């Protein structure tokens, strides 16, 4: 089964517009750091940046080319549809969801999450529902059939704007696994 990381990226943030391409230091911007971090994982080579069709996000495309990762453009408000169409186009059976504004995504945690996903075969695995990791280190993994079900059944605007809200609101419908840190440091904010 083909597995890929979809990195959700846009420049039109309300809290900090343009954050995705803001320079961190002389070595690169936030998106470059995110992608370079996740490239250190052991299991996945397919990385796709899923951005919007908005013209302001045209600036993201040269970064994807520079870093030699694929890109996909889709709906700016229906992020769930953007993910679904991206996963469908690239024939992904398993999707890892990362956001482009979290440069401290740890590839070792990503590796552990992927290994646990393959071992337990849940519909959805994350460090989001039962939080022990700092904010800004979110990793979510789900299979395409789960994404298809969510895409088909999510009706609320909040369930379309946020890719996995439907899963969190309907946990009884899914086999869910959690990754937890050895102690609870979820009070920290790394984003």
Enumerate the language-model features and the residues they cover.
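N-terminal nucleotide-binding beta1-loop-alpha1 segment
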Residues: 1-17
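A short, N-terminal amphipathic alpha-helix
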Residues: 29-47, 60-62, 66-67
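Short phosphate-binding loop-to-helix
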Residues: 53-118
